[in-house]
Amino acid sequence: MPGPDGWDDDAGATDVVRGVPFRPMSISELLDGAIAGIRRRPRTTLGLSVAISTVIQVTSSVAAYFFIGDEARDEVTPDVLLESLGAQLTLTVLGLVLSACGILLMAGLMAPILGRELVGMPIAPRQAWRDARPRLGRLAGTAAAVMGASLGALALAVLPFFALIAADAHPAFGVIAGLLGFPLGIGLMVWLYILLVQAVPAVVLERRTVTGALRRAVTLSKGRWFHTCGTLLLALLVTVFMGFFALRIPFLFVQLVFFGDASGDGATMGALAVDTLGRIVSWSVVLPFDAGVIALLYMDRRMRREGFDLELRSRGRSAAAVIAGGPAHEPAAEPAHEPIGEDGFIDLWRTDPVPARPWTGANP
């Protein structure tokens, strides 16, 4: 039943994207909400996703051409094969790092979209860009910090292995260092990534510094690490299925039919172009899904840990009134001709004191 000023008394009736309740969400609701967010705002989400995916995949393809283009045309010998395997491993790691950075950047851009849906505010096609644009520098810095911390933990754990190999130590020591270092490094990398991933939505919505967003992510993740890990793991499985089996196979088939037996620079460039196009298409679809899950995880943690949904409902007023900063049961002092600015939406999410805006009469 509708409550005062538009809030619904039924906690399950008001939703994020007309399918996800405005309350703490289950894992299935988080995944469904990310998909529904893409369907409801396809032009906004897919437009941002195509831009990010194109940069990532073109960069990967250019690196692939310069890393293995010559080796692919050479006669296959043990040395060439070893160099090719090393290049493939390097390209795989580079692709994973770039993809993870793209997901983090997209999560920061998706946060205002889903945040406005959460409080029932309209979203213009370029609204997400206007919300995130003032924070692009810190968003990129936060994404780099999350990836840097995760990869740094992996590097520190495997450093003894490579140091022993470089020092030509006894093989047994290298084997022991590898058996201990690689699992430990991978575990630390995953643990830190999941612990810090919510810093990306926080730096955009809460207007925090990079270090402040990282501390905020640690606070929000307390006691819910395994829940976050399980949710992101399921999202990864969906991504692999949609991105490879459903979307990449047609392009791989075209690549095999037209360039499978061909040789020469033209065939190499053609096969690489088709493969790049396939990766752009597949990543443009799955990237906003992964990013939406991260953004919704942040909002879920705000509601579970801090009662963000209950805080807004307890004020007994609409989102517009909350943004305007008017008294709980009085109309907002906003002039009819003054539109609600982007900073008003951000004020909903900030946890620090908000400066007063003269036209509302709101107190800091």
Give the residues covered by each predicted segment.
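Perimembrane loop-to-helix junctions flanking transmembrane segments
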Residues: 70-85
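Selective recognition of hydrophobic, aromatic-rich stretches within alpha-helical transmembrane segments
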Residues: 2-19, 85-124, 169-213, 245, ...
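Hydrophobic alpha-helical transmembrane segments in multi-pass membrane proteins
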Residues: 48-68, 88-104, 140-167, 176-193, ...
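Membrane-embedded alpha-helical bundles of multi-pass transporters/translocases
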Residues: 33, 37, 47, 134-146, ...
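Juxtamembrane transition segments at transmembrane-helix termini in multipass membrane proteins
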Residues: 2-7, 192-205, 232-364
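Membrane-interface alpha-helices at helix entry/exit sites of multi-pass transporters
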Residues: 127, 139-143, 215, 228-231
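Membrane-interface elements of multi-pass transporters and channels
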Residues: 65-74, 113-121, 152, 156-171, ...
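Nonpolar helix-loop interface/hinge motif
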Residues: 4-68, 188-275
